[in-house]
Amino acid sequence: MQPYNQSVNEVLEETKSQFEGLSPKEVKNRQAKDGFNELKEKKKTSTWELFIDTLKDPMVIILLLVAFVQLFLGEFVESLVIFIVLMINSVVAVVQTKRAESSLDALRQMSAPSAKVLRNGEKTSIPARELVVGDIVSLEAGDFIPADGRLIDVQNLRVEEGMLTGESEPVEKFSDVIEGEVALGDRKNMVFSSSLVVYGRADFLVTAIAEQTEIGKIAQMLETAEAKQTPLQQKLEKFGKQLGWVILALCALIFAVQILRLFTTNQTADMQKAVLDSFMFAVAVAVAAIPEALSSVVTIVLSVGTNKMAKQHAIMRNLPAVETLGSTSVICTDKTGTLTQNKMTVVDSFLPTQGSKELTDLTQADQKLLLNAMVLCNDSSFSQEGQLLGDPTEVALIAYSDKIGYPYQDLREKSPRLAEFPFDSERKLMSTINDFEGQKTIFVKGGPDVLFNRCNQVFLDGKVQEFTPELKEKFQAQNEAFSQKALRVLAYAYKPVSDNKTELTLTDENDLILIGLSAMIDPPREAVYDSIAEAKKAGIKTIMITGDHKTTAQAIAKDIGLMNEGDMALTGQELDALTEDELRENLEKISVYARVSPENKIRIVRAWQNEHQVTAMTGDGVNDAPALKQANIGIAMGSGTDVAKDASSMILTDDNFVSIVSAVSIGRVVYDNIKKSISYLFSGNLGAIIAIVFALVVGWVNPFTALQLLFINLVNDSVPAIALGMEKAEPDVMEKAPRQLNEGIFANGLMRVILIRGSLIGIAAIISQYVGQKTSPEMGVAMAFTTLILARTLQTFAARSNSQNILKLGFTTNKYVLMAVTFCLALYSLTTLPFLREIFSIPAAFGWSQWIVAAGLAVIAVICMEILKSIKGVFEKH
């Protein structure tokens, strides 16, 4: 028998629970037996699969082929070194990926939804994942239902279950037994995980958690999409394949030229050795040209970016989002809780006899009535731990009562509640019956415009009087005055009723006596002002999209600097009235959208995307999911539903607009740093190729062995390239216009930088080889290798910025670069040790005089890079 066929007592018995809830010990036992209330994640890629993936890179495959050929030819040391280096590279990439995965998993837990649960007779708020079968959970309007369950106490509950049933209308719920087997949409005494409470209140008994819930049974619908490569990684992979073919062609050409030279110069005496040398020359070019560390460096820098963002309260759900975020040109943000503190505070009240003022004297009948209405017609409370429970607006009212010296619990104890009619979005009212000073009294609170029309009398000068048109006008004028200040206004009324009145109906909310108004505000977050200004400076348009009133939204928008002179504010209805052409014409001028629907949100996003703008959109509800999917960057609130989080690219753990702008800034820095790493790697490789090709053309010996180049590319270069990924933001990172998503890898002068730096490194290596081979060809190779490794290492300082020279930056402002350079110099010194000299082709005669020349040439090359950078800066300034 299903829970919906059973009475409440039968379900309690079956789940071994009781009306007071479970004990902590029983909860622990059930969690140990059944696990937590969360859907199982997809099977993660195993460590072994990650390791194999690192070997699928086209550049790694070429190196593996080289290693096997060398092994076949008897070059055991060099082939072994290639295998070891590739193994180390793969292990580092796997470790970093696993570390990023585990930190992301830990951070995701921060954004878990919560549930109000009854345990041992006490109501408390817990993470929804800690729910067990048998728990009793309280629901109210706006709540996300955290598990499946049988309703046991219902007060006008309506739930939106469209995600499960396809029905667009909210379902009215009850607690009676249902006979026979019925479809999911007809189980009206049940609630289901991931549904939304539209209005009303209820308590339910948890009957299913995690995979056993209805949503758990269709969990594949909510599974996160497969991990995708970032656009940059796709471009690099495509470029890598093209580079691979070019390198193979170049190697074949060099090998052919070498063999041809052997025959034309009659150097065929030791043909096998000559062919082997020619092959190794070609291999050296392949090794020199391939940036072996590039793939892992990009992944590591992106992962570092995700960790930095997480510290700024922004959890990135995939790597492509980090890159896309840096291109954001439009941010569509909610108002409540994102731009504001989501902490409503009562700042004013209005009584017809006293005007606008704070309540201070409850000996006056009108003040006493107003404060009691605020506290009694109110479902919020504080837990024993001081935690806020309930709607933020209602919490503000009881907090106000406590603040002015009248504890809300005392007022409620003096006037106990006898019946209630919960708030709903159709009536825009809430009513209760309380035993107030020995008289059954209905208290009503709601929107001023609605409540004014329900009143025919007003409490004035200590007695009930007619609510005349003049008095109504006075109230309406005060309501408008409050609204102009972006204050949220509630009106309060009451009506004495007979002692036999036990329940409320719609007709009871008429012929009321108006008491007064309260005004509250959700103040803007302090840091929002600077963040809006920073976004504007960065060429990012910030748009407020809210369900609040247009007047309130405009007032907040103007206050925080989001709305300027000439900007427009539209309601959802006004937006619906615009044609696509009219919307396109006015799009740039519209800064505020108020009272919007989910369909409106999608239309706004598409309108900006049609203008080729990269758009970020915030959201927290099930209805926001389509707009979050549509946006280039969907941003879910940490307090939002799992459906919204699933549709998003990023989760804000603090629901704060400031965190969005911080994440955009980090996204820009990450992309800049990846390009710095790319320029560093390709400049060094180009320098090596220039030296090799020059040696081939003029008939010198190959300036580098394949082992030397592998050592530089894989061991030496990867550490500085990663260190560049840790570089702080350039001063103007948030002063540039947003980057276009389709921007090429080498755009904005990056290719020019690579050509200049690569040429300087190559020329330095050529001169070094020329000086060295006056002693012997072996000395030329040793000096060229020394100059190349030192120039590429010291180039790290130049690569830190394309606009600022190292003297301005300072040598110690990036400790990671300093450590990387020190590490590389220490590594190089190892190659000069007696037992390693032979492996790295460094002759015994190589001493201080040769080292000083080689190192001096490397330093000169880097100084030239910095001089050219400064000259470029002067030209750009003028």
UniProtKB/Swiss-Prot annotation:
<dbReference type="Pfam" id="PF00122">
    <property type="entry name" value="E1-E2_ATPase"/>
</dbReference>
<feature type="transmembrane region" description="Helical">
    <location>
        <begin position="281"/>
        <end position="301"/>
    </location>
</feature>
<dbReference type="InterPro" id="IPR001757">
    <property type="entry name" value="P_typ_ATPase"/>
</dbReference>
<feature type="transmembrane region" description="Helical">
    <location>
        <begin position="845"/>
        <end position="865"/>
    </location>
</feature>
<comment type="function">
    <text>Catalyzes the hydrolysis of ATP coupled with the transport of calcium.</text>
</comment>
<feature type="binding site">
    <location>
        <position position="292"/>
    </location>
    <ligand>
        <name>Ca(2+)</name>
    </ligand>
</feature>
<dbReference type="InterPro" id="IPR023298">
    <property type="entry name" value="ATPase_P-typ_TM_dom_sf"/>
</dbReference>
<keyword id="KW-0106">Calcium</keyword>
<keyword id="KW-0109">Calcium transport</keyword>
<feature type="transmembrane region" description="Helical">
    <location>
        <begin position="704"/>
        <end position="724"/>
    </location>
</feature>
<dbReference type="InterPro" id="IPR044492">
    <property type="entry name" value="P_typ_ATPase_HD_dom"/>
</dbReference>
<dbReference type="Pfam" id="PF00690">
    <property type="entry name" value="Cation_ATPase_N"/>
</dbReference>
<keyword id="KW-0812">Transmembrane</keyword>
<feature type="binding site">
    <location>
        <position position="288"/>
    </location>
    <ligand>
        <name>Ca(2+)</name>
    </ligand>
</feature>
<comment type="similarity">
    <text>Belongs to the cation transport ATPase (P-type) (TC 3.A.3) family. Type IIA subfamily.</text>
</comment>
<dbReference type="InterPro" id="IPR018303">
    <property type="entry name" value="ATPase_P-typ_P_site"/>
</dbReference>
<keyword id="KW-1003">Cell membrane</keyword>
<feature type="transmembrane region" description="Helical">
    <location>
        <begin position="50"/>
        <end position="72"/>
    </location>
</feature>
<keyword id="KW-0547">Nucleotide-binding</keyword>
<feature type="binding site">
    <location>
        <position position="290"/>
    </location>
    <ligand>
        <name>Ca(2+)</name>
    </ligand>
</feature>
<dbReference type="GO" id="GO:0046872">
    <property type="term" value="F:metal ion binding"/>
</dbReference>
<dbReference type="GO" id="GO:0005886">
    <property type="term" value="C:plasma membrane"/>
</dbReference>
<dbReference type="InterPro" id="IPR036412">
    <property type="entry name" value="HAD-like_sf"/>
</dbReference>
<keyword id="KW-1278">Translocase</keyword>
<dbReference type="InterPro" id="IPR008250">
    <property type="entry name" value="ATPase_P-typ_transduc_dom_A_sf"/>
</dbReference>
<protein>
    <recommendedName>
        <fullName>Calcium-transporting ATPase 1</fullName>
        <ecNumber>7.2.2.10</ecNumber>
    </recommendedName>
</protein>
<dbReference type="GO" id="GO:0016887">
    <property type="term" value="F:ATP hydrolysis activity"/>
</dbReference>
<feature type="transmembrane region" description="Helical">
    <location>
        <begin position="779"/>
        <end position="799"/>
    </location>
</feature>
<feature type="binding site">
    <location>
        <position position="287"/>
    </location>
    <ligand>
        <name>Ca(2+)</name>
    </ligand>
</feature>
<dbReference type="InterPro" id="IPR023299">
    <property type="entry name" value="ATPase_P-typ_cyto_dom_N"/>
</dbReference>
<keyword id="KW-0479">Metal-binding</keyword>
<dbReference type="Pfam" id="PF08282">
    <property type="entry name" value="Hydrolase_3"/>
</dbReference>
<dbReference type="InterPro" id="IPR004014">
    <property type="entry name" value="ATPase_P-typ_cation-transptr_N"/>
</dbReference>
<dbReference type="InterPro" id="IPR023214">
    <property type="entry name" value="HAD_sf"/>
</dbReference>
<feature type="active site" description="4-aspartylphosphate intermediate">
    <location>
        <position position="334"/>
    </location>
</feature>
<dbReference type="GO" id="GO:0005388">
    <property type="term" value="F:P-type calcium transporter activity"/>
</dbReference>
<feature type="transmembrane region" description="Helical">
    <location>
        <begin position="681"/>
        <end position="701"/>
    </location>
</feature>
<feature type="transmembrane region" description="Helical">
    <location>
        <begin position="753"/>
        <end position="773"/>
    </location>
</feature>
<feature type="binding site">
    <location>
        <position position="713"/>
    </location>
    <ligand>
        <name>Ca(2+)</name>
    </ligand>
</feature>
<feature type="transmembrane region" description="Helical">
    <location>
        <begin position="243"/>
        <end position="263"/>
    </location>
</feature>
<dbReference type="InterPro" id="IPR006068">
    <property type="entry name" value="ATPase_P-typ_cation-transptr_C"/>
</dbReference>
<dbReference type="GO" id="GO:0005524">
    <property type="term" value="F:ATP binding"/>
</dbReference>
